[in-house]
Amino acid sequence: MDASYRRDGRGGGGGGGGGGSAPRSVEDIFKDFRARRTAILRALTHDVEDFYAQCDPEKENLCLYGYANEAWQVALPAEEVPTELPEPALGINFARDGMNRRDWLALVAVHSDSWLVSVAFYYAARLNRNDRKRLFGMMNDLPTVYEVVSGSRQSKERDRSGMDNSSRNKISSKHTSDVARVENNIKEEDEGYDEDDGDHSETLCGTCGGIYSADEFWIGCDVCERWYHGKCVKITPAKAESIKQYKCPSCSSKRPRQ
C-alpha cells in the first residue's frame, strides 16, 4: 500500500478536504471516525464474502483498514516506524481458518473498535478536556462494530419486546415532537450516512443504554437533552403530562454554580 494512502486516511479517491490535512475540530474528528467505522462495517457485513476471501492465512500479516472516504482495504501494515497513525490489529488472517467464522468476524470487529477509537483520539490529542469528553459521547452514541457484527444489539431489542406493553403507546405529546428518527435495520444504518444526517443517529437511553423504540415511553431532559426510558427514571406518561420542565436525575443532582 502507498504510504500516503495510509497517512491521509482517505485512499486514492480522497475523502474531502485538500492537502491531506488531519481533522482538528470535534465535528471533523467525529466525521472521520464515523466514515472509517462505516468502511469497517461494510467489510464485515455487506462485503463480508470479499473480505473473508482476501484474508488468506497463507499470506503475510494482514490488517483491515477503514478510510475517511468510507473505503476499506485488507493490506500489509505500514513500513515506516513509528507510523503516522495508530495501526490496526496485525495478522487478522492467521486465525481465519482456525475459528468459527462468526467468532472470527466478531474478533476482527473487537480489534477494529479499538483501532477506530485510537485513531480518533490520536487526532484529539490537542483537544481540551471538555471537547474530548464531547467527542467520546458522540462516538459512544453509535453502536460498536462488535455490537453490529455479533448481533448483540438486536438481541437486546428482542429481550425488551417481551415486556408488558400496556402503557407503552401512551407517549406524552409534549415529548414526542423532538424524538430522533431511528434507523430500524442496524446493519444498514450507516449506508449513505453523510454529514447532514446527524439527526438519524441512534438514540440511546441515558441510564441503561438501550436503543430507542417507538413502542416504549421515553422522556427527554430539557437541560442536557438526553433521552431516557420512563421506567429507568421512574416517570410515567401521566406524570410527564404535569411536568413543565423535566430534569434527569444527573442534572437534578448538579449543584448550581455559586
Curated annotation (Swiss-Prot):
Gene Ontology CC, one term: nucleus
Entry comment, domain topic: The PHD-type zinc finger mediates the binding to H3K4me3.
CDD domains noted in UniProt: PHD_AL_plant
Location(s), subcellular: Nucleus
Complexes and interactors: Interacts with H3K4me3 and to a lesser extent with H3K4me2.
Main location: nucleus
Cited function: Histone-binding component that specifically recognizes H3 tails trimethylated on 'Lys-4' (H3K4me3), which mark transcription start sites of virtually all active genes.
Stretch list, region Disordered: 1-24, 150-200
Species, as recorded: Oryza sativa subsp. indica (Rice)
Gene Ontology molecular function: histone binding; transcription cis-regulatory region binding; transcription coregulator activity; zinc ion binding
Biased composition (Gly residues): 11-21
Key words of the record: Chromatin regulator, Metal-binding, Nucleus, Transcription, Transcription regulation, Zinc, Zinc-finger
Lineage: Eukaryota, Viridiplantae, Streptophyta, Embryophyta, Tracheophyta
Pfam families: Alfin (PF12165), PHD (PF00628)
Zinc fingers (PHD-type), renumbered ranges: 202-254
Superkingdom as given in the UniProt entry: Eukaryota
Name the record gives this protein: PHD finger protein ALFIN-LIKE 1
Residue stretches of biased makeup (Basic and acidic residues): 1-10, 175-187
Site (Histone H3K4me3 binding): Y212, W218, D222, W227
Family: Belongs to the Alfin family.
GO biological process entries: chromatin organization; regulation of DNA-templated transcription
